[in-house]
Each structure stands twice: as structure tokens, then as C-alpha cells.
From Swiss-Prot:
Belongs to the bacterial ribosomal protein bL9 family. The keyword Transferase does not apply. GO terms for molecular function: rRNA binding; structural constituent of ribosome. The gene is rplI. SUPFAM superfamilies: L9 N-domain-like (SSF55658), Ribosomal protein L9 C-domain (SSF55653). This is Large ribosomal subunit protein bL9.
Length: 150
């Protein structure tokens, strides 16, 4: 299926590009999320009319993400979780827990933006985590997992 990208999509293309993707990817993800539109003749003409407006919105979104990234980069957050004597957690700290802790600290982060390269955190200590605020803005955050023993 031919689609027009309405925003930058990682590993696919930039705003305004007409790309060919699998039908399911377009119908089930890109079009419902507002990232793309079917590339019909009328849609292409409408897009060209709105192109400047969409580029301004994309630039504003990027600037907001960069400003948030400057504040967030290098921050350390602390999460308390039940742990055994050996420093292993009962359960784990997931991207949902980290996003929630960042939200309490005043940052707008959703769990899909938190990247855990080695999977959920299962030990007490300090762990580096990356947060992708935008496709072009990726920051590093330190998560300190504190074990509580009862």
C-alpha cells in the first residue's frame, strides 16, 4: 500500500515521503495513529496544501522534545522495590515503572518511550536507561533501584 507520511517514522521515512508498506502495517498502525495517510491523488494534493503547516507542527514537536530532553538528560531517579538479601528483586522494574517514576518527577514520558536494552531490571543498584522522547531525541537516564527488605 502506498502511503504519505504525516510525521517522521523511524526506519521508514520523513514527513511528506510517499512510501510503500505492507497493508496490515498501514491499516493497523500508521493510519490509526495519525502518522500516515493513503496516497491517493486527492490526498497528495491535500497534503501539499497543508505541508507547511505540518512541517511547522513537526518542528515545534521536535523543539519541545529537545527542551524536555535537556532537562531529563543525566537525571537519576530512584525506585524502591522489595528485594532479597542477595540483592535480587522479587519481581522486576519495567519500563512502565520507570515511566511512572519519571511522571512523578514532572516529566511527560510514556512507557513506550523507555528503552531497556537488557530487559526489565532485576537487581538492586544503578542501571543506565535510554528514553526516546522523539525519533531524533534520545536521552540517557540513570535508574537507581533500592531494595527494601521486610
Amino acid at each position: 500500500m502506498q502511503i504519505i507520511l504525516l510525521e517522521k517514522v523511524a526506519n521508514l521515512g520523513n514527513l511528506g515521503e510517499v512510501v510503500k508498506v505492507k497493508d496490515g502495517y498501514a491499516r493497523n498502525f500508521l493510519i490509526p495513529s495519525g502518522a500516515a495517510r493513503r496516497a491517493t491523488e486527492t490526498a497528495v494534493k491535500e497534503f501539499e496544501a497543508k505541508r507547511i503547516e505540518l512541517e511547522k507542527a513537526a518542528a515545534a514537536k521536535l523543539a519541545a522534545s529537545q527542551a524536555e530532553g535537556e532537562k531529563l538528560n543525566g537525571k537519576t531517579i530512584s525506585i524502591t522495590q522489595k528485594a532479597g538479601v542477595d540483592g535480587r528483586l522479587f519481581g522486576s522494574v519495567t519500563n512502565h515503572d520507570i515511566a511512572e517514576a519519571l511522571g512523578k518527577a514532572g516529566f511527560k514520558v510514556v512507557k513506550s518511550q523507555v528503552r531497556l536494552p537488557n530487559g526489565p531490571l532485576k537487581t538492586v543498584g544503578e542501571h543506565p536507561v535510554t528514553v526516546a522522547l522523539h525519533t531524533d531525541v534520545v536521552v540517557d537516564v540513570n535508574v537507581t533501584v533500592v531494595g527494601e527488605t521486610d
